Amino acid sequence: MKTNLSSQIKLDLVPKRYYAPENKIEYASLCREEKVFTQISETADGGVKSLADEVVETIKKNVEKKGKCVIALGTGNSVLPVYTELISRYENKEVDFADVVVFNLFEFYPTEAGAPSTLDRLNNLLLSKVNIKPENVHSFNQEVEKVDLYEGCRAYEAEIDACGGLDLVLCEIGVAGNLAFNAPGSQFSSACRMTLIDSVIRRSVLSAYDLEVAPATAITLGIGNILAAKKVLAMAWGENQAKIVKAAVEDKASETVPASFLQMHRNAKVVVDLSAAERLTRICHPWLVTLCEWNNKMIRRAIAWLCEKTGKPILKLTSNDYNEYGLNELAAQFGSAYNVNIKVFNDIQHTITGWPGGKPDADDTDRPERAKPYPKRVIVFSPHPDDDVISMGGTLKRLVDQKHDVHVAYETSGNIAVGDEDMFRYILVMDQIKKEFGLDTELYNQKSEEIKKFLAAKHPGDVDSLDLRMLKGRIRRAEAKTACNWMGVKPENVHHLDLPFYETGTIKKGDLSERDVKIVKDLISSVKPHQIFVAGDLADPHGTHRVCTDAVLAAIDELLDDGAEWMKECRIWMYRGAWAEWEIDHIEMAVPMSPEQLRFKRNTILKHQSQMENAPFLGDDDRLFWQRAEDRNRATAQLYSSLGLASYEAMEAFVEYHPIR
């Protein structure tokens, strides 16, 4: 069973010479916008092996030279695979940790019994699995009183100095551009100190340590301490890190992105995979730094970029514009700027359709979806019980109105995203109507009292009882059914899959299993769809979206292995959610909406009342989900309009997934 197919999706085929130049001259040209040495690996696995090579080499050199190697280690999620690789090297006798001295980069403070500890995590991940001597492991003393905190920090720095300073720092570039717990605003010369854990970093802590409530403060080595090391290796993996990697590597060093201070270090290296590097100039806009290897997507991206730079629509771009912005080779390749303009304009125009299921009895040569068969059987997979309407509510309504047989499959219950107050309101209503509806039974009254007592005694971070989770899940089911009914989806076509991996009761979910994939596979087999819509949030901050997508892709893969001929005729479209939209160079289908259709979509999203103002996982975006969706859809329409195409109120965009075989 292939459970990680989403990680193998490559929207771009990036020429190897862009990310792995063959010589120093080529590197100097390609990387002239980069202010710190940056190594791009095709995959995270390749980057992990490269980092492990450097760590092993550093250990051997320093042990041979002075009898020990002093390393500061972080415990962010990005570093974990490096530790796994180092353990493998140790077991294969490729490295010896007997003379390695370890300093903990950061530690939560103050601490209580049972509270999370980064040192415990580091011990579980690496230290206990190799031959590092206990006396060679150093961490901040969490028992220091707050009044003695300054002296405690200085004492920790003195321990580092007594060991001869740090030979190596191994850490991740955090989601906020942080190094260790040095959040935005940290000074270049900052020392070891107590720091507040900001809201963005706190969410990554919740995920890494499987917590409901993150510690508010921590002790961290400062930027100055990190830059004092002889070598710094920093890493970042995945598309969700692309924006911060660009800021750290190419933008001016700034306190707003502490990782950008790596630019000031003479022996710092940033190691990223292609996904995390996608906004670097040599990957995103290679025509600015080298002779470009043009393909249709790259051409579309370049012309959209040129329109943004000039403020002109596609068909008004001139040869002078191409020359001024370094795209003269593209114009020369096609004979003239006009020829490029026409090609790209037609290419993008053909993505627009008001018939997402295909227009019956029409020439479909230049349409994103085929005309036949009609009507089509369609499955829309929704990770949570509102992602369908948030991400593609306008498209879903069109599919229903155009008489396709539309099924909606809610992959998870979404129960942990219902607030206690919302759930308690339903209990109060049932208490008031129980006599009239014959619910005044001993069992109901017992359950009602148990729930009220549980809520009264509940503390932040406590896991909900099974009864609470069941009730919250039923609330989300009812909201989803209401929304589907509002759109005209048949009741029998609404499927609640309740995939087992989700049902842990905590933020941290289980691993995708054969049970999950079988549930999805059985549904697909029973419907035999001509179209499948699936979440394409490959940088999903929740994680659930990606796991749900992997479940669908694994099921499709198994069906193809089983020889399901009808599956070969099924087209799979990926949508994106409330966080980001597909880039213009990737969009293959764009479904427009009028003001009335956008208003209908908003009203459909509002059927999910538990996900409004008091929803637990709104993140640090102050906008509600319907506002995020509208802003995103309007921005897509505005982009099309700015390129000189038809002007719509809003648009939903899709990319076709071709099964990886």
Predicted regions: what is each one?
Residues 21-35, 95-168:
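Ligand-binding beta-strand-loop-alpha-helix segment within the catalytic cores
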Residues 2-12, 25, 230-326:
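ATP/nucleoside-binding phosphotransfer catalytic cores, i.e., glycine-rich phosphate-binding loops
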